[in-house]
Structure formats: structure tokens, C-alpha cells
């Protein structure tokens, strides 16, 4: 290993709590590359593969393979389908996704030509001179490398939203999000941000002679937005709803919860985490809406039915893990905390799958966003005299602190000023304690 790789390997071991929990080992001739891996693990895998005397093979998942920029001689695409995380079923890859993955073979400045082998799913069998590949497979291969790729068919996503609204699909997640994002809009020609009638969807409707139908759909959208606006009188809430995509009514309830807490507000990031979890446990709509993207992971971690809605019991199970994350505990300890809370016994922690889901999915894709909304609501939705009772430095640090895994804004600042690229969260906590014991930090 190079010096940089050794530092990355030390960071990986510190973050996980030992080498036995990692997907990698320094002697690997083949390395994985997937979303369950820590950032430092992926960096190490890429570095090992990049070296001519390093790993010979890198095995990447479908999505991540499209982003790898490594000098591969041969790209083997093990199937043209992938698992859908939401439905749990297999789905076909689009032609451009296969092309992106195939483009990993060869790299400008390193290897002009590369070889790509696509293994279809399911496997095909045919005999020379007797059978021929199915026509749909030939069509897919031709679509991957078209004769003329200069022209693209483009469409306006707004057109899809308007069609769903015209069909009264008001509970569709995309429709709800669009209406929320327009919470502070006025559907006037003078609209400073964006005039829907001058959108690409509007242009296409005019060209196709469907202007009246398009205008009718816009009127339905306008009426839905205005109906939401009539329920909220605080323009600051409407603005935040527009910025975040969260329903203004939900933000209003969160605002009242914050006001109720002003008498004895949380005094640490850990107390803010517990405060937020108590709110999510008590508010079914907030829990369902704000945790929708990570609901499957939360339920998987808690050992409950994966497709069920997030419930208070599931949040109680992951809470110790979140507190352990910000306290600087390694993932093996966080895994044990989650298992203990879920009352699950196991002989081996394996690769700490539950803790990895918490660190790689639930925290960055769910909790970080929610804490960002809390910070914005405190700064923009509470009167100035109310803000004076709160530690605003801590409020501003809530989202990045939970994302990076620190329990104070001071540690967050310490981590951002440290120049060590490979340093992990656990190592930073240890360095902070060391500096404090030496009297270098008050």
C-alpha cells in the first residue's frame, strides 16, 4: 500500500472498529465498490485498482459503475437489470445507463480502447447457423450505440405533473412536492420566478394545438396552490415550504413545537436529536412525509416488515445508533446498540450492515435534511426575541453535525479546520479528546 492508502486503511479500521468488519483487505486482488461501503473504503478500493501493482478487478454495483473513472481494460456488465430498492423487484436498465457503464472500459490518456462484455439477464443460448439472438436483444444493443447520437428527445417534467393533476392524482408524491414548492407563488403573468405558460411544456402544447387543454391543467394546479395558501397566513412559512417542498401545515406544527420548547430549549446536539425524535414519534404525518425516502432502511434496521410505514417503535430502535454516531462510536459499537434496542441476538456482527445503512442512508438522506429545516425554521420562522433564548451557533451546526457525526459545533469546527484528508469521524473525536486533555482546547 502507498502512504495515502495506509492512512485510508487506518481510517477505515477506526471507523468500523476493526478490519474484520470491512469489505476490504490489503491483500485483495479483487475489490468491491458499492453504496454500503464507507467513503474511505470506496476511495481505498479505487486507489488499489488504479495502481498497476494493486487490485486486478473492481466489482461495482450498477449505479456506482456508471460513475467510476478508472483505466479498466475490460468491463463485464453482469446483467442488464437491477434491483429496485423501493419495490424489491428487478427492473431493466435504460440504454444510456448500460452505455455509461460500458464506457468504463478504456480511458483517455491511459487506454484508448477497451473491451465490453454484456451478460444478458436471463442468459441466452443459441447455436451457430441454427438459432439467432432475439430481436429485442439486438434492438437494445443497437440503441446503446446508435448510429447518430446527436439528437435527443427531450420533455418537460412539468408536463407529467400536469397530466397527473388532470387525472386527480392528488396523493402522488411528485404532485404533492410540486404544489409545496409553489407555496409562495402567484400565477400571474408578472410572476418573477417562472411563468408556467411560457415553459417548454406550454410551448409543446401550443405547437400541438393543445393550448386550451394545457391552460385548463394550469388552472387546476393554480387552484390547488391557492387552496394551500389560504390555510397559512405566515408568508415566511410559505417561503420555507416553497424552498423545502414540505407542506406548510406540517411546518406550522413544527413551528408551534419549537415555540413550546422555548421555555426549556435543548442545550446540546444530543438533546436536539432526542427532541426531534420525540416530535417524529408523536406526529404521524411528519414521520410519513419526512422519512419517506429512508422508510425502507429504517424498517429493515429495526427488524420489522420492510414495506410497513415507519412507526415510533422503529425510531426508538435507531435513536441509540444516531446518538452513538454523533458521539464518535465506531460502527461495530453502533451495530451493537441498534441490535440491543431491537432485542436481536446474533453470533456475528458481520460487516455491520445496520450501522452502515444508518450512516450511508438514513442520516445523510433523511435526518440531515430534517435538521436543516429545523435550523431554517428557527432562523426565519421565530421572532428575534425567541431566537435570543437559543444557541444559534448550535442551531446552524445541527444539520452538518448530524451528517458528519459530531455532538457539538466546536467539534464540527475542529474537524473542518483539520487538514487530514483520510481522517475519519472516530479519529477526529479521538484527536479532539487528546487536544482537550492536553489543554489545547478550552
Give residue ranges: language-model regions.
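Conserved segment of the helicase C-terminal RecA-like domain
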Residues: 39, 70, 74-84, 89-137
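Beta-edge loop/turn motif
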Residues: 42-79, 103
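C-terminal or late-domain output modules
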Residues: 77-78, 82, 87-99, 142-158, ...
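Conserved C-terminal RecA-like helicase domain
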Residues: 1-57, 84-98
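C-terminal accessory/interaction regions of large nucleic acid-associated machines
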Residues: 8, 168-180, 219-442
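C-terminal helicase module of SF1/SF2 nucleic-acid helicases/translocases
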Residues: 104, 111-212
Amino acid at each position: 500500500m502507498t502512504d495515502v492508502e495506509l492512512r485510508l486503511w487506518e481510517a477505515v479500521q477506526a471507523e468500523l472498529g476493526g478490519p474484520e468488519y470491512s469489505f476490504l483487505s490489503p491483500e485483495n486482488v479483487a475489490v468491491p465498490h458499492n453504496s454500503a461501503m464507507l467513503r474511505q473504503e470506496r476511495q481505498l478500493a479505487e486507489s488499489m485498482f488504479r495502481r498497476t501493482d494493486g487490485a486486478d478487478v473492481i466489482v461495482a454495483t450498477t449505479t456506482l459503475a456508471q460513475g467510476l473513472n478508472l483505466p479498466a481494460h475490460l468491463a463485464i456488465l453482469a446483467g442488464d437489470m437491477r434491483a429496485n430498492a423501493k419495490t424489491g423487484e428487478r427492473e431493466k436498465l435504460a440504454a444510456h445507463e448500460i452505455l455509461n457503464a460500458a464506457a468504463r472500459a478504456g480511458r483517455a490518456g491511459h487506454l484508448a480502447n477497451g473491451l465490453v462484455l454484456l451478460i444478458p439477464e436471463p442468459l441466452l443460448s443459441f447455436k451457430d447457423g441454427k438459432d439467432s439472438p432475439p430481436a429485442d436483444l439486438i434492438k437494445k444493443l443497437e440503441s446503446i450505440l446508435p448510429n447518430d447520437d446527436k439528437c435527443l428527445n427531450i420533455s418537460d417534467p412539468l408536463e407529467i405533473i400536469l397530466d397527473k393533476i388532470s387525472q386527480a392524482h392528488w396523493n402522488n408524491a411528485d404532485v404533492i412536492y410540486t404544489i409545496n414548492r409553489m407555496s409562495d407563488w402567484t400565477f400571474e403573468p408578472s410572476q418573477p420566478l417562472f411563468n408556467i405558460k411560457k415553459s417548454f411544456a406550454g410551448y409543446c402544447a401550443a405547437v400541438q394545438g393543445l393550448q386550451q387543454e394545457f391552460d385548463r391543467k394550469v388552472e387546476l394546479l393554480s387552484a390547488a396552490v391557492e387552496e394551500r395558501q389560504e390555510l397559512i397566513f405566515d408568508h415566511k412559512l410559505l417561503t420555507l415550504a416553497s424552498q423545502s417542498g414540505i407542506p406548510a401545515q406540517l411546518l406550522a406544527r413544527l413551528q408551534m413545537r419549537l415555540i413550546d420548547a422555548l421555555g426549556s430549549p435543548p442545550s446540546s446536539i444530543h438533546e436536539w436529536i432526542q427532541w426531534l425524535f420525540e416530535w417524529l414519534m408523536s406526529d404521524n404525518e411528519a414521520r410519513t412525509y419526512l422519512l419517506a425516502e429512508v422508510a425502507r432502511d429504517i424498517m429493515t434496521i429495526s427488524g420489522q416488515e420492510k414495506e410497513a410505514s415507519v412507526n415510533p417503535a422503529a425510531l426508538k430502535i435507531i435513536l441509540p445508533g444516531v446518538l452513538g454516531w454523533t458521539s464518535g462510536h465506531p460502527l461495530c459499537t453502533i451495530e451493537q446498540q441498534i441490535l440491543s434496542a431491537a432485542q436481536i441476538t446474533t453470533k456475528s456482527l458481520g460487516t455491520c450492515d445496520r450501522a452502515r445503512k444508518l450512516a450511508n442512508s438514513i442520516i445523510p438522506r433523511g435526518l440531515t435534511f430534517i435538521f436543516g429545516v429545523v435550523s431554517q425554521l428557527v432562523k426565519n420562522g421565530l421572532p428575534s426575541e425567541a431566537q435570543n433564548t437559543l444557541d444559534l451557533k448550535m442551531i446552524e451546526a445541527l444539520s452538518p453535525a448530524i451528517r458528519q457525526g459530531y455532538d457539538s459545533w466546536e467539534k464540527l469546527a475542529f474537524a473542518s479546520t483539520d487538514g487530514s484528508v483520510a481522517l475519519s469521524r472516530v479519529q477526529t473525536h479521538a484527536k479532539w479528546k487528546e487536544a482537550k486533555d492536553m489543554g489545547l482546547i478550552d
